[in-house]
A protein has these predicted regions:
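Hydrophobic/aromatic residues within transmembrane alpha-helices
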Residues: 23, 32, 85, 111-113
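Cytoplasmic-side transmembrane-helix entry/capping segments in multi-pass membrane proteins
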Residues: 29-37, 62-68, 95-96, 121-126
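C-terminal transmembrane-helix exit sites in multi-pass transporters
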Residues: 102-122
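Helix-helix packing/entry segments at the starts of transmembrane helices
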Residues: 31-38, 80, 86-106
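Hydrophobic transmembrane alpha-helices of multi-pass small-molecule transport proteins
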Residues: 44, 120-136
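Juxtamembrane helix-loop-helix junctions in multi-pass membrane proteins
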Residues: 15-40
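Membrane-interface interhelical linkers
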Residues: 1-11, 27, 40-67, 79-88, ...
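Hydrophobic/small/kink-forming positions within alpha-helical transmembrane segments
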Residues: 10, 14, 18, 45, ...
Length: 137
């Protein structure tokens, strides 16, 4: 089941890039990011209430709060950079560079989360990096 959600994420992320590139014409990148973020906030809280998870907010530990806030700050910084890059460059070049986050995530997961980094992972990272270079050059 996780695979279907991951595939859905990839499909929606692809749609996001195209819709954002079209929608950002004539709009400041920071304003566009703020509008997008408002929609995401409304949608996310809607899902919390639809699934009756709002009561769980009181059970979130201080550590979880800190890391969720840090994650939110990183997401915001990522979106601000992404929208500015998308406004200035071609989606066909911006998106592959943005997807280098896969390689960076694998490395960070190995360093900080002590997740396994196999030979297959190394080859995959090299191929993603090479593919990104091929697409943007």
């Amino acid at each position: 089941m996780w695979f279907l959600f991951a595939l859905g994420s990839a499909i929606f992320a692809a749609l996001t890039s195209i819709l954002a590139k079209i929608g950002i014409e004539g709009v400041g990148s920071n304003l566009a990011t703020a509008i997008r973020t408002m929609v995401v906030v409304i949608m996310a809280w809607g899902m919390v209430f639809i699934t009756h998870q709002q009561a769980g907010i009181k059970d979130i530990s201080q550590k979880c709060w800190i890391f969720l806030i840090l994650s939110g700050l990183a997401t915001g910084a990522s979106w601000l950079c992404y929208y500015k890059a998308l406004q200035m460059g071609d989606a066909s070049k911006v998106v592959p560079i943005d997807k280098l986050s896969v390689v960076i995530t694998l490395i960070l997961a190995f360093v900080f989360l002590h997740e396994e980094f196999t030979f297959k992972s190394v080859i995959g990272c090299i191929l993603i990096g090479a593919g990104t270079l091929l697409m943007v050059l």
